[in-house]
Amino acid sequence: MISLEQVTVQRQGVIALDQVTHTIYPGQSVAVIGPTGSGKTTLLETIAGLLPVQSGNVSFADSSSTTDSPLNQQLIGFVPDGNRTWPMIRADECLELFAMNSGLRGKQIDDAVNRALEEVSLGNLRGHRIDTLSSGQSKRLLIARALLCEPHILLLDNPYAGLDPVGFQIIDQLTTNAQLTGRIILAVFNDANVPDNFTDLLVLNDGQKVTAGHFQPKQFTNVDKWGVRLKCPSSAAQAAKIIRHLTLSSTVVDDDFLTCYLPTNRGPIEEAVAALIKAGCPLESCTYDPPWPAQVLYSLIRD
């Protein structure tokens, strides 16, 4: 468990986190969103023990970050944003150095390096020099480094940036498996385009926690309307008429696509979908446009 109690953190004399209180439980995968400068990366670095806490407390079960370094306890794996400049050594040699620095010895190092490389599908490149890896492979090596000690907590800063398709699948699998293994995943997203396999959403603004809840649109009551895009092949105009009584406004984009705003106080999006199906109107897809976490964020900033 991660517990933050009235945590305040400064960066270069400016408050970056302002009395943030939040608890994250084993098995939760939490997506953190917010505008640029809202404190998202600062939150991760504070939990990782990389930034000092001015006031308040960060604790992990019975261990407080003010007295112990969670990274040294092999508790946390941290994947920073972007790629890093690596030494000109082999991939496996690089991980061996990090494993030793984490306190592993002898066979523990070999086992950890082999497992981490396989987990990110780099086992066949273990003997390659790091400077020969592609940017996507290099980002996967960062993930492997974070997984060396099988951490209970995995912190991901903008995890999909710079990843190749294999890396996308790895992050998705880690997130899905967290609920089964009890691992905590805390991931920062700069664009609020969050995959739906996360369990929770945390919104920051100006260094403060604005709202949080389970990863379901209905949990966020600050939104008064949802933007939706429907694909009704050759029937967009017909669809607009069918759900007119449920919408605040609608726009027929072309013969196939319709965008509309649905008020949250008239029922969920499923009601509009049900109305179209009942009327026999062809419906191929119905999606939030933009993604609903982004709409939650925009609504909070607007207010």
Which residues are covered by each model-predicted region?
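Conserved ABC ATPase "signature" region
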Residues: 96, 100, 108-125
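ABC transporter nucleotide-binding domain
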Residues: 179-184, 189-259
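Q-loop/switch helix immediately C-terminal to the Walker
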Residues: 82, 88-101
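Conserved ABC transporter NBD signature motif
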Residues: 56-67, 71-72
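Conserved ABC ATPase signature
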Residues: 129-133
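Catalytic Walker B motif of ABC-type/P-loop ATPase nucleotide-binding domains
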Residues: 154-158
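Helix-to-loop junction immediately C-terminal to a conserved catalytic motif
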Residues: 48
